[in-house]
């Protein structure tokens, strides 16, 4: 069975990963996800307007010779948030390196020890599972429990 994921599936995974990932200042220095998520959310809000303005200004000034270039600029502007969502989707399905996998297992064990129910530890966790565990840890563990890692 192939490990490759289609574009549409990656975009859906990217959107869900964007919602799952805990946007916390403690994680900003360790993981690039926070910066990618902020840039992607900004792009989702702003880039459609940039695309429309780039085409409409050429039409408003009757500069139809420059319309093909403005359409290319518009397509590029619209593609920027899609690139961020695609990157997040690909990242969410990437297996964790050994150091992060052990960190995932330690966090999982700490949450289970405090009495919270979790799904069983994954043998080969992905960034998606790490995001779920980090989200759970920040919501349910107190600051003294998290001091070791952050």
From Swiss-Prot:
GO cellular component terms given for this protein: plasma membrane
Keyword presence, Membrane: yes
Stated family: Belongs to the UPF0208 family.
Record-linked InterPro entries: UPF0208 (IPR007334)
Keywords: Cell inner membrane, Cell membrane, Membrane, Transmembrane, Transmembrane helix
Chief place of localization: membrane
Coiled coil: none
Localization: Cell inner membrane
Topology class, membrane: Multi-pass membrane protein
Name this protein carries in UniProt: UPF0208 membrane protein VP2081
Keyword Metal-binding: no
Annotated source species: Vibrio parahaemolyticus serotype O3:K6 (strain RIMD 2210633)
Parts of the chain that traverse the membrane: 42-62, 70-90
